[in-house]
Amino acid sequence: MTDSLEYNDINAEVRGVLSSGRLKLTDQNIIFKNNKTGKVEQISVDDIDLINSQKFVGTWGLRVFTKSGALHRFTGFRDSEHEKLGKFIKDAYSQEMVEKEMCVKGWNWGTARFMGSVLSFDKDSKTIFEVPLSHVSQCVTGKNEVTLEYHQNDDAPVGLLEMRFHIPAVESADDDPVEKFHQNVMSKASVISASGESIAIFREIQILTPRGRYDIKIFSTFFQLHGKTFDYKIPMDSVLRLFMLPHKDSRQMFFVLSLDPPIKQGQTRYHYLVLLFAPDEETTIELPFSEAELRDKYEGKLEKELSGPVYEVMGKVMKVLIGRKITGPGNFIGHSGTAAVGCSFKAAAGYLYPLERGFIYIHKPPLHIRFEEISSVNFARSGGSTRSFDFEVTLKNGTVHIFSSIEKEEYAKLFDFITQKKLHVSNMGKDKSGYKDVDFGDSDNENEPDAYLARLKAEAREKEEEDDDGDDSDEESTDEDFKPNENESDVAEEYDSNVEDDSDDDSDASGGGGDGGTDGSTKKKHKEKKNEKKEKTHKEKEKIKKPTKKKDTGKPKRGTSAFMLWLNDTRESIKRENPGIKVTEIAKKGGEMWKELKDKSKWEEAANKDKIRYQEEMRNYKSGAGGGSEDEKGGTSKATKKRKSEPSPSKKANTSGSGFKSKEYISDDESTSDDQEKVKEIPKKKNKSTAEDKDKNSKKSESEGGDSDDASNASEDDDEEEDEGSD
């Protein structure tokens, strides 16, 4: 026989919610540990009264009855594990794992049976449903009915609020069945009532969350917080953990209670109660128990009279009544000589306490992180000149908690603690000591060179130099391209009477200044390349544009399908049968009806006839009866469009008188869009004439202006004839 069985993915029922966790069965105990809260529940072998198996949706589970009447249900077992688990229970616990039969008829009348702390509603000896009475918060009786109210679980998306039982009156019965039912429920229900004498009362205790001063009354099964505005009744079994932590200045003490389920104040939930005490405040209380009760009920852990600091007295009473040990700060001692590490979490400052099995942050908001929840931790630097760092904790569920503004002096102690607990550090390389020594080894020596900061400065310097170079080049390019009076100078050269003055200015500007001659030539080359690129892109865009095809109205209409013929015929009937139907949904509805239609021969014959009609008309259309084919029409239209879109440049020159320029006035940087073609035809040698050649040409133009005009017109006529011949 195996010593134990362990299952990592088992769900336990907790107030209507299946909480995941780990289940371990040994020959001494059945242990379940909740993954979310870390709460551990143990069932001793001596306390087990009955073990059954029960079928659930898609799986099966265990029902464990204890001798005290409590019912524990665990689900999530595979079918293959049934035989193995049954054999282990028989050998280890001497129990037969019998299957529990359930009634699935759906009836709402039957017999109510009380078995321990469970109300079972049966029909024909089969259980319809079960109600753990520990989930009942209140029981109210009526004339012939009983109403049960239940505790709510915040993790449950849907919860049962109340249930009513109708109990018919029986004349022969001596006892009232309604009253008897009520007594059976209340004897096992978890009803919080402040009746009876309280065990201890602590007055005006300062609580940080929820904020205020409260009187704390402790009863045997719950404790009550009574404030000026709010009152809370908290069951003892809802307390998960107790923490007693000293303040960093050692002048105050924190007493923290972890709650599940949390208490509510409006829409705010408080998972932790944080009580604040002064160490010098003392109190003396006397418990209302006899010596025999203290010895038998509490095993001598409490004395009849308790005295000392308030936090010690309250902690001792809570520890015994709740049955949980108080967790202290552990062995960690920070740079300040205390267990608290000052830091900021979210928007508030507080203290981080490294514990033996986790971290706890106090106080706004309080947070407890167990080591088994942590995936990795990370030490993040806040900057080379700052004297603090950030501590990042990444959980296995992906959540990241960042504790910032921690003093660098705390790094060595915190790092040693983490390595001792064997937590994974995400930003640690192979050389752990190197990171420790370089980043935080000597926090006082701020004059050591920072390689990271130096690299950032170098990159910023390079970027500034690149930006300066880019600005210079941009300024040069804008100066070259910017010509506000370019169009005005063109008009002046064409139509002004004093043309020689403008040309002389241009020649003086081009020829003057011997130092800038080389710069001017390079600029002209740069402009020529730009103009050539612009002309190429303009021509390419013209080539890309394609004429749109016009729809041929004479082309025959395609044949209609059988479905469309049927839909056109039944469209009105669909609208009548479905008033308010959308236009887009008519086709969808018709498709469903078409699939269900069995006899489609009528519409298929009509579709075939329409198809034959289309083929005949298309044959006549292509042969020429219905007009030319679409391709032929498209071809002719393309040809005509091409001729229209490509007029000869000579015609354009003749029609516009402003487009003419004599050769001596044409320069590469003063060409308009109309005479770009002419600029290309002029040889470059003539464009690179010196100032002397320009003077000679200007004198010749005065005397031979008429001859040059005739010659240019003749050359243009020759060019026009050549273009027409090429077309």
Curated annotation (Swiss-Prot):
GO biological process: DNA repair; DNA replication; regulation of chromatin organization
GO MF terms, alphabetically ordered: DNA binding; histone binding; nucleosome binding; RNA binding
Domain of life assignment: Eukaryota
Ranges of compositional bias, category Basic and acidic residues: 529-555, 596-620, 675-703
Positions of transmembrane segments: none
Pfam families per UniProt: HMG_box, PH1_SSRP1-like, POB3_N, Rttp106-like_middle, SSrecog
Record feature DNA-binding region, as residue ranges: 556-622
Compositional bias segments (type: Acidic residues): 464-479, 487-508, 704-727
Family in the record: Belongs to the SSRP1 family.
Protein name (Swiss-Prot/TrEMBL): FACT complex subunit Ssrp1
